Protein backbone atom coordinates (compact mmCIF):
# COMPACT_ATOMS: atom_id res chain seq x y z
CA UNK A 1 0.00 0.00 0.00
CA UNK A 2 1.46 3.35 -1.01
CA UNK A 3 1.58 6.22 1.47
CA UNK A 4 0.09 9.52 0.19
CA UNK A 5 2.65 12.23 -0.32
CA UNK A 6 2.41 15.65 1.28
CA UNK A 7 1.43 17.21 -2.04
CA UNK A 8 -1.43 14.71 -2.43
CA UNK A 9 -2.66 15.55 1.06
CA UNK A 10 -2.57 19.28 0.32
CA UNK A 11 -4.51 18.74 -2.89
CA UNK A 12 -7.08 16.53 -1.15
CA UNK A 13 -7.93 19.06 1.55
CA UNK A 14 -9.51 21.73 -0.73
CA UNK A 15 -11.43 18.99 -2.54
CA UNK A 16 -12.79 17.65 0.74
CA UNK A 17 -13.82 21.15 1.79
CA UNK A 18 -15.65 21.77 -1.49
CA UNK A 19 -17.50 18.47 -1.14
CA UNK A 20 -18.36 19.24 2.48
CA UNK A 21 -19.60 22.71 1.51
CA UNK A 22 -21.83 21.24 -1.19
CA UNK A 23 -23.19 18.71 1.29
CA UNK A 24 -24.09 21.45 3.77
CA UNK A 25 -26.01 23.37 1.09
CA UNK A 26 -27.87 20.14 0.25
CA UNK A 27 -28.66 19.75 3.94
CA UNK A 28 -30.13 23.25 3.88
CA UNK A 29 -32.60 22.10 1.23
CA UNK A 30 -33.54 19.04 3.29
CA UNK A 31 -33.87 21.18 6.43
CA UNK A 32 -36.12 23.61 4.56
CA UNK A 33 -38.40 20.75 3.53
CA UNK A 34 -38.44 19.55 7.14
CA UNK A 35 -39.32 23.04 8.40
CA UNK A 36 -42.06 23.38 5.79
CA UNK A 37 -43.58 20.05 6.84
CA UNK A 38 -43.56 21.25 10.44
CA UNK A 39 -45.31 24.50 9.47
CA UNK A 40 -47.91 22.46 7.59
CA UNK A 41 -48.34 20.36 10.76
CA UNK A 42 -47.20 17.17 9.04
CA UNK A 43 -44.75 16.65 11.90
CA UNK A 44 -45.58 16.67 15.58
CA UNK A 45 -43.81 19.22 17.75
CA UNK A 46 -41.87 16.59 19.74
CA UNK A 47 -40.74 14.86 16.54
CA UNK A 48 -39.65 18.12 14.93
CA UNK A 49 -37.80 19.24 18.07
CA UNK A 50 -35.76 16.02 17.96
CA UNK A 51 -35.28 15.64 14.20
CA UNK A 52 -34.44 19.34 13.89
CA UNK A 53 -31.01 18.72 15.40
CA UNK A 54 -29.96 16.31 12.64
CA UNK A 55 -29.13 18.91 9.92
CA UNK A 56 -26.88 20.82 12.29
CA UNK A 57 -25.16 17.73 13.64
CA UNK A 58 -24.61 16.34 10.14
CA UNK A 59 -23.53 19.71 8.74
CA UNK A 60 -20.98 20.35 11.47
CA UNK A 61 -19.84 16.74 11.23
CA UNK A 62 -19.02 16.88 7.52
CA UNK A 63 -17.20 20.21 7.94
CA UNK A 64 -15.07 18.88 10.79
CA UNK A 65 -14.36 15.72 8.79
CA UNK A 66 -13.24 17.91 5.87
CA UNK A 67 -10.66 19.65 8.03
CA UNK A 68 -12.43 22.69 9.44
CA UNK A 69 -11.68 23.29 13.10
CA UNK A 70 -14.17 23.67 15.94
CA UNK A 71 -13.16 27.32 16.07
CA UNK A 72 -14.03 27.78 12.38
CA UNK A 73 -17.46 26.33 13.18
CA UNK A 74 -17.73 28.64 16.22
CA UNK A 75 -18.09 25.65 18.54
CA UNK A 76 -16.27 27.12 21.49
CA UNK A 77 -17.06 29.11 24.61
CA UNK A 78 -15.92 32.73 24.45
CA UNK A 79 -16.90 35.99 26.15
CA UNK A 80 -19.68 38.15 24.74
CA UNK A 81 -18.27 41.48 23.60
CA UNK A 82 -20.05 44.79 24.20
CA UNK A 83 -20.66 45.18 20.48
CA UNK A 84 -21.94 41.62 20.31
CA UNK A 85 -24.28 42.29 23.23
CA UNK A 86 -25.57 45.41 21.49
CA UNK A 87 -26.28 43.49 18.29
CA UNK A 88 -28.04 40.67 20.15
CA UNK A 89 -30.15 43.19 22.07
CA UNK A 90 -31.16 44.85 18.80
CA UNK A 91 -32.07 41.49 17.24
CA UNK A 92 -34.07 40.53 20.34
CA UNK A 93 -36.16 43.72 20.29
CA UNK A 94 -36.57 43.70 16.50
CA UNK A 95 -37.62 40.06 16.26
CA UNK A 96 -40.19 40.23 19.06
CA UNK A 97 -41.54 43.58 17.83
CA UNK A 98 -42.02 42.02 14.40
CA UNK A 99 -43.67 38.73 15.41
CA UNK A 100 -45.63 39.30 18.63
CA UNK A 101 -48.15 41.82 17.19
CA UNK A 102 -49.31 39.22 14.62
CA UNK A 103 -49.51 36.38 17.14
CA UNK A 104 -52.63 35.12 18.91
CA UNK A 105 -52.30 34.53 22.65
CA UNK A 106 -52.90 30.89 23.61
CA UNK A 107 -51.49 30.82 27.12
CA UNK A 108 -48.37 29.24 28.56
CA UNK A 109 -47.45 25.66 27.80
CA UNK A 110 -44.43 24.91 29.93
CA UNK A 111 -43.17 22.06 27.77
CA UNK A 112 -43.40 24.26 24.67
CA UNK A 113 -41.68 27.13 26.47
CA UNK A 114 -38.85 25.27 28.16
CA UNK A 115 -38.31 22.23 25.92
CA UNK A 116 -39.44 22.89 22.35
CA UNK A 117 -38.51 26.59 22.21
CA UNK A 118 -34.88 26.08 23.35
CA UNK A 119 -34.58 23.00 21.13
CA UNK A 120 -35.66 25.04 18.10
CA UNK A 121 -33.39 27.98 18.91
CA UNK A 122 -30.32 25.82 19.55
CA UNK A 123 -30.84 23.52 16.56
CA UNK A 124 -31.33 26.46 14.17
CA UNK A 125 -28.16 28.17 15.36
CA UNK A 126 -26.23 24.91 15.18
CA UNK A 127 -27.09 24.53 11.51
CA UNK A 128 -27.20 28.10 10.25
CA UNK A 129 -24.35 29.68 12.21
CA UNK A 130 -22.10 26.66 12.88
CA UNK A 131 -22.57 24.79 9.59
CA UNK A 132 -24.11 26.92 6.83
CA UNK A 133 -22.22 30.14 7.57
CA UNK A 134 -18.80 28.39 7.74
CA UNK A 135 -19.69 26.57 4.51
CA UNK A 136 -20.57 29.89 2.85
CA UNK A 137 -17.35 31.44 4.16
CA UNK A 138 -15.39 28.50 2.75
CA UNK A 139 -17.15 28.88 -0.61
CA UNK A 140 -16.58 32.63 -0.89
CA UNK A 141 -13.22 32.67 0.89
CA UNK A 142 -12.27 36.32 1.52
CA UNK A 143 -15.69 37.76 0.62
CA UNK A 144 -16.98 37.44 4.15
CA UNK A 145 -19.76 40.02 3.81
CA UNK A 146 -21.19 38.20 0.81
CA UNK A 147 -21.02 34.89 2.68
CA UNK A 148 -22.87 36.29 5.71
CA UNK A 149 -25.54 37.83 3.46
CA UNK A 150 -25.98 34.59 1.51
CA UNK A 151 -26.41 32.51 4.65
CA UNK A 152 -28.94 35.08 5.90
CA UNK A 153 -30.89 34.89 2.63
CA UNK A 154 -31.05 31.12 2.99
CA UNK A 155 -32.14 31.54 6.60
CA UNK A 156 -34.97 33.76 5.37
CA UNK A 157 -35.97 31.31 2.63
CA UNK A 158 -36.01 28.54 5.22
CA UNK A 159 -39.15 30.24 6.59
CA UNK A 160 -41.07 29.88 3.30
CA UNK A 161 -43.51 27.36 4.81
CA UNK A 162 -46.53 29.72 5.17
CA UNK A 163 -46.62 30.04 1.37
CA UNK A 164 -47.79 26.41 1.20
CA UNK A 165 -50.64 27.22 3.57
CA UNK A 166 -52.07 29.79 1.19
CA UNK A 167 -50.51 32.86 2.80
CA UNK A 168 -50.19 35.64 0.18
CA UNK A 169 -46.69 35.96 -1.27
CA UNK A 170 -46.15 39.59 -0.08
CA UNK A 171 -46.89 38.52 3.49
CA UNK A 172 -44.55 35.54 3.18
CA UNK A 173 -41.85 37.89 1.87
CA UNK A 174 -42.37 40.11 4.92
CA UNK A 175 -42.16 37.04 7.17
CA UNK A 176 -38.87 35.98 5.56
CA UNK A 177 -37.46 39.50 5.92
CA UNK A 178 -37.43 39.16 9.72
CA UNK A 179 -35.12 36.09 9.86
CA UNK A 180 -33.01 37.52 7.02
CA UNK A 181 -32.23 40.66 9.02
CA UNK A 182 -31.92 38.70 12.26
CA UNK A 183 -29.57 36.29 10.50
CA UNK A 184 -27.27 39.14 9.54
CA UNK A 185 -27.17 40.24 13.18
CA UNK A 186 -26.57 36.75 14.51
CA UNK A 187 -23.99 36.04 11.82
CA UNK A 188 -22.09 39.24 12.62
CA UNK A 189 -22.11 38.58 16.37
CA UNK A 190 -21.03 34.95 16.01
CA UNK A 191 -18.13 35.94 13.75
CA UNK A 192 -17.23 38.89 15.98
CA UNK A 193 -17.06 36.87 19.19
CA UNK A 194 -16.04 33.53 17.68
CA UNK A 195 -18.77 31.52 19.39
CA UNK A 196 -22.32 30.40 18.60
CA UNK A 197 -23.23 29.96 22.28
CA UNK A 198 -24.64 33.45 22.85
CA UNK A 199 -26.74 33.35 19.69
CA UNK A 200 -28.12 29.97 20.78
CA UNK A 201 -29.13 31.41 24.16
CA UNK A 202 -30.68 34.55 22.71
CA UNK A 203 -32.49 32.75 19.87
CA UNK A 204 -33.93 30.34 22.43
CA UNK A 205 -35.11 33.22 24.63
CA UNK A 206 -36.96 34.76 21.68
CA UNK A 207 -38.94 31.56 21.21
CA UNK A 208 -39.55 31.17 24.95
CA UNK A 209 -41.17 34.62 24.95
CA UNK A 210 -43.09 33.86 21.74
CA UNK A 211 -44.18 30.35 22.77
CA UNK A 212 -47.57 31.38 24.28
CA UNK A 213 -48.60 32.76 20.87
CA UNK A 214 -49.68 31.02 17.69
CA UNK A 215 -48.84 32.40 14.27
CA UNK A 216 -50.25 31.93 10.81
CA UNK A 217 -53.62 30.85 9.42
Describe these PLM feature segments.
Residues 17-25, 82-89, 151:
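Select subsegments of transmembrane alpha-helices in polytopic membrane proteins
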Residues 27-37, 92-102, 152-161, 204-213:
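Aromatic-anchored segments of alpha-helical transmembrane domains
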Residues 1-70, 190, 208-217:
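N-terminal, membrane-interfacial amphipathic/helix-forming hydrophobic leader that caps
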Residues 36-52, 62-126, 133-134, 138:
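Juxtamembrane helix-loop-helix connectors linking adjacent transmembrane helices
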Residues 107-217:
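Transmembrane helix-loop-helix hairpins at the membrane interface
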Residues 15-18, 69-76, 164-169:
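Membrane-interface interhelical linkers
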